[in-house]
């Protein structure tokens, strides 16, 4: 009896019981990991002065070590930047709509292209995908795996015409001059508009003007897409912070209601989240649909474009241009490091997967990066972010005056740095006693991800200013 009680007690307080970030009182272990990034960052600063006082030689070696590590990273950054830029440039030249349509008749198109030579981006991979679809399911490796009941997974490849895109654009108090170009970019996409469900999630806190904007957009685009759905996110809902995540989550729940009414299969709907200033490449939706079809494990994938902060780059003040270009370079580099790629800003994920895991977190400011960890833990490690090598263009920070612009830029960078909150979210699960039993995740792969997460935030906070 005692053992059963003990087992129940351990299960009750398991870190794996919920995907949500705890609010209010946290455990000592959780607080330790919350403190860890800041403590390490301060330690690196303080250590430089302490070592210099104890021994100038040791202090010099410590500083040289930091500079040497940074130099090695810089070489890798240059290489990945050039590689990523070339990939993005070549991918933008591909007619992804044509490639998607070629999946309708894979056997015929494989015979036509199997001996063809082309320098087009990922042309050989496209031919292999046609072969995979034309030969049949028996040769698909993932079909040979067994599920938890000892049966083979059913592998299917949906037809291009069966795919629906649901685009969720969220906004707070932005004007029509910002909102309309974003909707227009989706409208001008090479993907068929009548298979795009556009959801506009706006905040009640945005006031009467935002409600008018939503009404205008709904009327203006009512006949453009399969459906244009304005959704007002009520203010002051329980267990929510003020941020993008709750708005996105609320809009997604309304989307689910609509999809059910239309009898559209959840498994064939891909959801893309957009900020109000995002302008997607015309190929983006076709590119995502293509990758969605050719990957049998599609429900356990999300699709990450390259975010470039260049919409208003020549209007922004010089300091903001430098930061915007640096952030754009970082995203280009990330697209070439698929083993470390995480969700950032705009991204796409299957509706079926989102509905099963409870959509996005309503308790974190950085809902995009946090979504990676939610998905990873929900799928017990069987989750991956697939790079989409075309851009979604965003605004560089710009306000009415230089002082306001600098303040807004600081707030944006600070908001991104809140991603350090994921260190505790990941750490408590990594070092939990029931990680193997309930999380079904191996220690070393998760430890490597945890260390990269921790190192990234410590580097940003401590090493960058020191160098």
Language-model segments: which ranges?
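N-terminal membrane-anchoring/stem segments of glycan-assembly enzymes
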Residues: 1-155
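Short, structured coil/loop segments at alpha-helix boundaries
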Residues: 23-31, 51-63, 123, 193, ...
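Internal catalytic domains of large membrane-associated glycosyltransferases
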Residues: 89-421
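Basic/Trp-rich segment in TM-proximal cytosolic loops or flexible interdomain/linker regions
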Residues: 2-42, 52, 87-90, 335-337, ...
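Hydrophobic alpha-helical membrane context
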Residues: 85, 287, 380, 464-467
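General helical secondary-structure elements
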Residues: 69, 229-232, 448
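Hydrophobic alpha-helical transmembrane segments of multi-pass membrane proteins
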Residues: 62-66, 169-170, 341, 454
């Amino acid at each position: 009896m005692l053992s059963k009680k003990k087992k129940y007690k351990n299960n009750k307080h398991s870190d794996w019981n919920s995907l949500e970030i705890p609010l209010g009182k946290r455990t000592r272990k959780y607080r330790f990991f919350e403190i860890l990034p800041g403590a390490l960052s301060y330690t690196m600063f303080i250590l430089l002065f302490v070592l210099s006082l104890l021994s100038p030689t040791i202090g010099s070696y410590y500083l040289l070590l930091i500079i040497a590590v940074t130099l090695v990273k810089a070489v890798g950054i240059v290489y990945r930047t050039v590689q990523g830029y070339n990939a993005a440039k070549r991918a933008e030249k591909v007619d992804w709509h044509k490639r998607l349509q070629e999946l309708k008749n894979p056997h015929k198109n494989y015979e036509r292209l199997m001996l063809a030579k082309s320098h087009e981006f990922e042309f050989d991979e496209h031919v292999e995908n046609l072969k995979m679809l034309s030969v049949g399911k028996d040769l698909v490796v993932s079909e040979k795996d067994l599920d938890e009941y000892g049966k083979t997974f059913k592998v299917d490849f949906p037809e291009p015409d069966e795919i629906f895109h649901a685009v969720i654009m969220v906004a707070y108090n932005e004007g029509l001059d910002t909102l309309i170009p974003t909707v227009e970019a989706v409208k001008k996409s090479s993907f068929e508009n009548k298979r795009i469900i556009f959801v506009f999630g706006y905040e009640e806190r945005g006031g009467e003007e935002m409600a008018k904007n939503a009404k205008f957009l709904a009327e203006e685009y009512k006949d453009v897409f399969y459906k244009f759905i304005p959704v007002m996110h009520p203010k002051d809902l329980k267990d929510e912070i003020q941020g993008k995540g709750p708005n996105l989550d609320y809009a997604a729940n309304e989307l689910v209601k609509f999809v059910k009414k239309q009898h559209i299969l959840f498994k064939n709907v891909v959801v893309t989240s957009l900020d109000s200033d995002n302008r997607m490449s015309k190929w983006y939706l076709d590119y995502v649909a293509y990758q969605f079809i050719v990957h049998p494990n599609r429900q356990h994938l999300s699709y990450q474009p390259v975010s470039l902060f260049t919409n208003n780059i020549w209007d922004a003040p010089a300091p903001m241009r430098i930061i915007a270009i640096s952030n754009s370079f970082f995203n280009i580099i990330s697209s070439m490091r698929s083993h470390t790629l995480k969700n950032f800003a705009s991204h796409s994920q299957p509706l079926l997967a989102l509905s099963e895991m409870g959509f996005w977190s309503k308790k974190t400011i950085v809902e995009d990066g946090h979504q990676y960890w939610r998905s990873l833990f929900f799928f017990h490690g069987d989750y991956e972010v697939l790079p989409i090598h075309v851009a979604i263009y965003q605004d560089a920070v710009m306000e009415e005056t230089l002082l306001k612009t600098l303040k807004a830029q600081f707030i944006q960078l600070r908001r991104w740095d809140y991603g350090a909150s994921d260190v505790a979210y990941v750490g408590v699960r990594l070092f939990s006693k029931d990680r193997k039993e309930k999380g079904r995740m191996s220690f070393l792969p998760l430890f490597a991800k945890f260390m990269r997460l921790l190192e990234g935030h410590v580097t940003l906070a401590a090493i960058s200013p020191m160098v």
